[in-house]
Amino acid sequence: MFVTLIKPLARLHPRAWDFVQLVRLDRPIGIYLLLWPTLWSLWIAADGVPELKNLLIFVLGVILMRAAGCVINDFADRNFDGHVARTKARPLATGKISVREAWITFAVLVALSFGLVLLTNATTVWLSFGAVAVASLYPFMKRYTYYPQVVLGAAYSWGILMAFTAERGELPASAWLLFLANVLWTVAYDSYYAMTDREDDLKIGIKSTAILFGDADRLIIGSLQGLTLLLLALAGSRFELGLYFYLGLAVAAACFVWEAWSTRDRDPQACFRAFLHNHWAGLAIFLGTVADYALR
């Protein structure tokens, strides 16, 4: 549906689709995986009634910052992507978009995001600098550490902190439970993603948790998902959430079980489907959160 909505952009200019691909608007899974935990937190921070202004700011901010993250990622990987089957057609790798054009795109996206943050409060503005720093750092970590997914987890969890400060003007200690839960969840699902490229990454020297975990990959991913659910349950207790929130967690748990079963042979396509499937887990938790507040 999302891709259908943006298809008309290809007719605006002969090169428009190249930029759509650069910022991955044609692959919205990253938007969803960033959006759901941000919205969990926005709803919890606002006791179920977030300000419309903040809702719009965070939805647009998620789209813009995920796009910016894709640009800096492709810049960092431009000399590697051509050697990986899944990424060899990316616009920077093929030369359809120049490095200069990529940097201009990145700057515009960050500037627009910052303009949105300026509509919140000082604490959230200060936090936004950390968001840009972590998002920019992640792509380069793949050269130096087997834990780039942890950095990605921090980047994908930063919106949780900002949602609380935007709604409450402060950051309660319990918000860190949501932050840590999302970091662990991100490491889990991005490890599935890294499993699809593991053989290519080994050849070109790119590091990932999928390589680090080796034959224990599915066991460790399952353990991370279990810890994610435990931390979310603890957060639910701290924020006095009820039955529907925990039903959302139960659906997410079922999603995680399906992912473990479907990747039992470690087929790269199955691992990629498991990665995509996490969107449904995040959506289930969000719907459970919304229902819990709405039906009180």
Curated annotation (Swiss-Prot):
Co-factor(s): Mg(2+)
CDD domains: PT_UbiA_COQ2 (cd13959)
Positions of transmembrane segments: 29-49, 55-75, 102-122, 146-166, 169-189, 219-239, 241-261, 275-295
This protein's pathway: Cofactor biosynthesis; ubiquinone biosynthesis
Entries under Pfam families matching the protein: UbiA
Signal peptide start and end residues: none
Subcellular location as annotated: Cell inner membrane
One BP term from GO: ubiquinone biosynthetic process
Main enzyme class: transferase
Cellular component, GO annotation: plasma membrane
Chief localization: membrane
Family recorded in the similarity comment: Belongs to the UbiA prenyltransferase family.
Protein task: Catalyzes the prenylation of para-hydroxybenzoate (PHB) with an all-trans polyprenyl group. Mediates the second step in the final reaction sequence of ubiquinone-8 (UQ-8) biosynthesis, which is the condensation of the polyisoprenoid side chain with PHB, generating the first membrane-bound Q intermediate 3-octaprenyl-4-hydroxybenzoate.
PANTHER family registered for this protein in UniProt: 4-HYDROXYBENZOATE POLYPRENYLTRANSFERASE, MITOCHONDRIAL, PRENYLTRANSFERASES
Protein name: 4-hydroxybenzoate octaprenyltransferase
